[in-house]
Structures are given as C-alpha cells and as structure tokens.
Amino acid sequence: MNRLRYLTAGESHGPSLTAIIEGMPANLELNEGDINRDLARRQLGYGRGGRMLIEKDKVNFTSGVRWGKTLGSPITLSIQNRDWENWGKKMSPVAEDFVEGMAITHPRPGHADLTGVIKYRQDDARNILERSSARETAARVAVGALCKKFLADLGMSVLGYVSELGGVCADASLEDYHERFALSEESPCRTFDAEAEQRMIKAIDRAKEDGDSLGGVVEVAVLGAPVGLGSYVQWDRRLDGRLAYAMMSIQAFKGVEIGLGFEAGRRPGSQVHDEIFHQGDEFVRKTNRAGGLEGGMTNGAPIIVRGAMKPIPTLYQPLQTVDFRTKDAFAAVVERSDVCAVPAAAVVAEAVVAIEMAQAMLEKFGGDAMEEVKQNLQAYGEYVQRF
C-alpha cells in the first residue's frame, strides 16, 4: 500500500514556508504554474487584509522534480515570504539580534496565543502566533495543488466555493457543480449566486466599518472518484472521518458536514437514505444525501463536504484580554488581519480534501510511477463494470 505523507514548516513572518511530500509517483507532469495558480487563488477574495498586497506567492521546487516530471523521490516546495524584508530582526534566529521590549503579552481571544504560551512555556505570544497563523495554509495549498494535478490525471476534479458568508446563503438550486465552480471563480466572494454575492459584499463592508469580522461556510465537491476508496474495517481508514479531520485542521474551522450533515439528524430515515437502482450496466442513486460516502467508502456519487469557518478573531475593535505577565486588563493586541477570509478558505478546503483523496487513491491503486497507477485504476474500473 503506497502512502502519501507531508510536512509543512515555516513562520508567518519568517523567510519562507516549506513543504516536503513523500509518496507521489514518478512521471507526473508538473510545473510551477500548476502550483502558483492555486496560490494566487488563495490570495484573492473580498475582505482580505493588507498582507495580500505584499505577498505574491510563488513556489520553487527544490527536490523531486526534473524537466517537468516528478521523480518518485520526496518533493520539496518552498514559498518565499516577501514580508521577511521587514521582519529580519524581529524574527531572527540569531541570539544577538534580540530586541528588548518587543514581547506580545496581551493574548487575543479566539487565537492560540494564551494556550500556546502556557503549553510551550514562552514569555512572548509572537513565538506562538507566527506558526499558528493561517499563513501556514499557503504551504498546504501548494501540496493540495500538487495532489489536484495527480487526481486530474486520473479523471477527478476537486472544486471549492463559498455557500454562505456572514449569514448570507447562496441559492443551492444550481445543481451542476462544474457550473457552480465556474461562476464562483469570477466572484470576489467566491460564490456562485450573484444576488447573494452583493449581500455578502455589503455584510463585509459593514463589518469593516464596525471593526468586526465575518465567517461563513465553504463547500468542496469531488467529482469522478471511483467506488470503494476508503474502508470500513478500521475507524481510521474511514474516508469520511479522514476528510472531516482534514477540514477541521484548517485554522478557524469549527464544524464539518458531509452530504446532508446535521440535517440528517432532523429527518426520518425515509428522507435520508439514497435508494439504489440498476440502470444499464451500473448501480445508481437518484439522490445524494450521503454526500458520496457510505460506510466510510466512496459510492461513486459526487463527494460533498462543507466546513464552517468562524470569524477571524483579530478585530480592529479589540476584545477584552489580560496581560499574562501582570494579569492586568487590556484590549487584545491588533495584528494585521482580514475582515473576512472565507473566499480564501474555500481554496484551502479544496487543498486538504485533495490531499486526502490523493492518499486514498494511492492506497487503492498505488504504484511507483503514474503509468502503474493508471493501469491499476483501469483494471479496477473494468472489474466494476462487469460486477
């Protein structure tokens, strides 16, 4: 069983972000544009902050790719932080560069600041917030873009967009996921409903005027996944659990749904389960309330995953906190931030879902080279057609 794994490293205002991916087969055609396209998408969206005017993320391959193809060895991706020019002393690894009086001691509610300084025995929340920052997601988007390229070569698509923002819901009557995605790519709020988009923009503008922030819900659709990815035989091999884990690992995500999600708990069984029919030479379901996953496995229908993102906790009208040294009351520190990052979160959600789907495909059809993976997938597809 082939296994795909990765690590990311780097601080928000450090020199760079780095990701190392192991397990990607050889001979996948790949270029920097495949990665940079999604890095640019992550930086777009109505409500983003000033950092996006500084960073223009570009990836650099430093291992694992030669002449436009993967080698089968670990792939290293590096993304330079342009803002490092302004932070060289503040984030220096050299002890002699220490500057007195720069410690952040007013932890921000809703962030990792206070718990982090307690856990890691720090006296400066800067040492926590630099790594806990959502800037880290740029590295995961790069890994996800690589996985999306792998999946595309196997006939699969991973499409992310915004279904709700600041309490404004997009009209879900549009059922064509490719059309939803195409429309959302033209939207500053990354949504497919033009009327809802205008109300979302107004909500973001109001929040900015009030020094507040907004959250929302993103949806990811996976199209073209074969039957039988994942497994029911152990809890940690259930693909729905792994997708939920991946989505919940995104900074500021507080809830995940697959298919009907929580609505399934409000309906009788007759309105939840997808009836099975046989048409032509295949089994079909006329509904997809399960969201493409039954028993922890893909059933051949589109996989539909949604994630709820809370409002960004850095507010320009700061919430109450205390100085963790003196215990005196203060307003929370204001770090440069977004009013709303939900449109960007849809791209991050795409990435983490793509990583899990690539892992599941390699577990089922893995090989050392893309040619072998495709042969295994084709043989399995022929078996499914005969069943």
Curated annotation (Swiss-Prot):
Binding site for FMN: R131, S132, S133, Q251, A252, G295, K310, P311, I312, P313, T314, R336
Signal sequence, renumbered to the chain: none
Superkingdom to which the source organism belongs: Bacteria
Any one Gene Ontology molecular-function term assigned to this protein's record: FMN binding
Pathway, per record: Metabolic intermediate biosynthesis; chorismate biosynthesis; chorismate from D-erythrose 4-phosphate and phosphoenolpyruvate: step 7/7
GO cellular component: cytosol
Reaction equations catalysed: 5-O-(1-carboxyvinyl)-3-phosphoshikimate = chorismate + phosphate
Free-text cofactor note: Reduced FMN (FMNH(2)).
Requisite cofactors: FMNH2
Keywords annotated in UniProt: Amino-acid biosynthesis, Aromatic amino acid biosynthesis, FAD, Flavoprotein, FMN, Lyase, NADP
Top EC category: lyase
Matching Pfam families: Chorismate_synt
Residues where NADP(+) binds: R42, R48
Any single GO BP term: amino acid biosynthetic process
UniProt EC number: 4.2.3.5
Family note: Belongs to the chorismate synthase family.
Assembly information from the UniProt record: Homotetramer.
Job of this protein: This reaction introduces a second double bond into the aromatic ring system.
Name listed for the protein in its UniProt record: Chorismate synthase
The species this protein was found in: Syntrophotalea carbinolica (strain DSM 2380 / NBRC 103641 / GraBd1) (Pelobacter carbinolicus)
